[in-house]
């Protein structure tokens, strides 16, 4: 079985998460339906929501390990490029800005899931949303001016579109540890 596909920027293949028994791995699914493993992970790690960087060189993933879920950036061959978050928060749903300078994700670091953004060059972390019901699955527009995400409300899950004005974000300082 394959799940959570991410189309490569050139449109030639997908990166998918594969599961077998208690292990999961990343695989490349080509247009001709051939599938080749990219990276296998031990039983202590669970990979989710891979997404290609705009230049196609990297994948951002959410990885569950040692009781927490963090954001990692992998090379296309599945080797670790950088660990983005490393703290007690559960971080998931990575999404790149179209220029590759920002990585957005949802996190429960305040007790409620909201959208955060990290400027990869400076390692500065910002809280982008502040909603009571939780915010998930960020999707920045190609021009960076709009952010769409899922949010819980009294009606269930809603799709919310908001201005992506960085002047409205709350700066949360630098990441807990330097990016690897």
Residue ranges, per PLM feature:
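Interface/linker segment at the passenger-translocator junction
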Residues: 172-180
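Beta-propeller blade-edge and WD-like acidic-aromatic loop motif
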Residues: 13, 17-39, 58, 62-83, ...
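A short local loop/turn or secondary-structure capping micro-motif enriched for an aromatic residue
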Residues: 3-5, 23-25, 45-46, 68-69, ...
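Conserved beta-propeller blade repeats
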Residues: 1-17, 42-62, 82, 86-106, ...
């Amino acid at each position: 079985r394959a799940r959570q596909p991410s189309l490569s920027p050139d449109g030639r293949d997908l990166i998918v998460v594969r599961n077998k028994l208690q292990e999961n791995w990343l695989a490349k699914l080509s247009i001709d339906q051939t599938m080749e493993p990219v990276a296998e992970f031990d039983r202590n790690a669970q990979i989710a929501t891979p997404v290609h960087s705009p230049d196609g060189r990297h994948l951002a993933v959410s990885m569950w390990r040692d009781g927490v879920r963090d954001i990692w950036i992998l090379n296309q061959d599945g080797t670790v490029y950088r660990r983005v978050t490393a703290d007690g928060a559960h971080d998931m749903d990575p999404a790149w800005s179209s220029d590759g300078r920002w990585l957005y994700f949802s996190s429960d670091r305040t007790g409620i899931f909201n959208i955060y953004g990290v400027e990869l060059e400076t390692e500065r972390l910002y809280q982008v949303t502040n909603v009571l019901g939780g915010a998930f699955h960020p999707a920045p527009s190609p021009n960076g001016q709009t952010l769409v995400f899922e949010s819980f409300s009294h009606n269930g899950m809603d799709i919310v579109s908001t201005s992506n004005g960085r002047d409205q974000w709350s700066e949360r300082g630098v990441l807990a540890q330097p990016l690897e």
